[in-house]
C-alpha cells in the first residue's frame, strides 16, 4: 500500500484543470472562504492500494457540481488560442443530474476521456421506510460520515495534493485491511442495509476482514427487518451477481454465510445441510484449480456459466428440495434465484437443470452398470450444450452428499466418466442426427403415432449410440425385431 497518491499523466492533467478552474471561480468571487476541491471515495482507496481507477468523484463546497462543471467550459473558453490547445479535445459531454433542490444538482463531465462526477459536499438523513436519504448541503465531515465504510472516506485535496483522513481511521483501516463503518454499524445498516452486501463485496474483492462490530450489527434482528423492508430484490440480485463475477467468489460466499447474511438474501438454512457450504467451497476451489488437468476440455465456460456455477454452490443446501409451480416441479435454488434475487432466466434455468440432473450423473459415477454409451449419450443429448456445466456441478453435488464424502475420490470417479465420454466420442451427442424421422419409422417399422412412436424413436437413438457406424437397414431390422 502507498503512503501517498501518485498521479498518472491523465490524472495530472485533470487535477491541473480542476485547480485552474477553482482559481478562475475564486477570481470572480467576493467571498473570503476558499473553494475546496477534492477527489473522493473509491478512486482514493484504489490509488493507495496501487490499483488503477477511472472512477473519479469530485466533491465541492460553495458551488454545485453543475456550476463547477460549467465553469470548466467557461474557463477553457476564456483562454487565448495558444493556451487553449491542451484542452481542445479534452472536454466531452456534460450531463446534468437534476435534483429537487437546485443547490444539490450534480453533473457528470468527460475530461480527457474520463467520466467524472461533480457533487457538492452533503449531509444525509434517513427515515425507517427507505434507504434513499434526504440530502442537504454539508461539510467535508458530514460527507465523510455519510459514506459506507471508513476505507471510502478518504479525500485527495487537489490544491495540496495531500490525503485527508477526516475520520482519523480511514488510512489505518485501509492499511490493516479492516472493513468498519464511520458511524455506528447498527445505525449505518438501519439507514441503508444495502451497505451490508456492498461491504461483503468489498471485503471479498480486496481480501479485507470485517470488523466484529460490523458482523454483530449484521446479525441484529432489527437490521434483518430493515433489509427486507428497504432493499429491493433486484438490488440484492445485482450485488450477489457482482460478488460471484469477481475474482474471489469463494471468499464472498464464505462471508455471506459466516456473517449470516444468507438468511435475508437466500433463505433459512436447513440445519442438516450446514456442512455442505464449506465442502462445496472446498470442492469448487479444487475444481477450478485442477480443471486444466482433470477436465481440460470443459475449461471454456462462459462468464454466465461460471457465475451460475458459483450461484449453484451458494444455494447447494436447498438443491434437493422442490416445489410445484403451476403443475411443474421446480427446485428451490431456481425459485430463490427467480423470486428472491430476481436474476435472469439464464441462471434460473441453469440452476433447475443442474439440480434435476445432478443425481443422474452421481448415479452414473457410483454404479458402473449404468455407464454405457446408450445411457450417457442419451443424457448428453437431453442436456444439449449445457451438459458440461451440469457435469461440473454434479462433481460438487457428489462431493457434498455426505459429510464423509471424499473430494479426491469423487474427482477420480468423475475423471473416469469424463474419459469415457471423450473416448467414446459422446461429447457432441446432442448433434447426432436420427437415422430415421417419425414418418419413416411409421412406414418402415409399422408403428402408430403417439407413445409407441416415441418409445421406438428412443430405442433407435439408443441403438445408434451402441452402433455409431450402423446403417439405416440395420436400424430398421433392429426396430422391427422389437415388435416380435
UniProtKB/Swiss-Prot annotation:
Subcellular localization(s) per the UniProt record: Cytoplasm
Motif (ERhxxExxxhh motif) on chain: 234-244
Any one biological process term the GO annotation gives: mitochondrial tRNA 3'-end processing
Enzyme class: transferase
Record key words, sorted: ATP-binding, Cytoplasm, Nucleotide-binding, Nucleotidyltransferase, RNA-binding, Transferase, tRNA-binding
Motif window: B/A element: 122-124
Residue numbers spanned by region Flexible loop: 125-142
Domain of life: Eukaryota
GO cellular component: cytosol; mitochondrion
Catalyzed chemical reaction(s): a tRNA with a 3' CC end + ATP = a tRNA with a 3' CCA end + diphosphate
Molecular function, one GO term: tRNA binding
Location (main, coarse): cytoplasm
Function: tRNA nucleotidyltransferase involved in the synthesis of the tRNA CCA terminus. In contrast to what is usually observed in eukaryotes for which one enzyme synthesizes the whole tRNA CCA terminus, in S.pombe, cca1 specifically adds two cytidine residues to a tRNA substrate lacking this sequence while cca2 specifically adds the terminal adenosine residue thereby completing the CCA sequence.
Domain description: The B/A element (residues 122-124) is present in cca2 but not cca1 and is thought to position tRNA-NCC for terminal A addition.
PANTHER family assigned to the protein according to its UniProt record, in alphabetical order: TRNA NUCLEOTIDYLTRANSFERASE CCA2 (PTHR13734:SF9), TRNA-NUCLEOTIDYLTRANSFERASE (PTHR13734)
Family indicated by similarity: Belongs to the tRNA nucleotidyltransferase/poly(A) polymerase family.
Name of the featured protein: tRNA nucleotidyltransferase cca2
Native source organism of the sequence: Schizosaccharomyces pombe (strain 972 / ATCC 24843) (Fission yeast)
Organism lineage string: Eukaryota, Fungi, Dikarya, Ascomycota, Taphrinomycotina
Record gene name: cca2
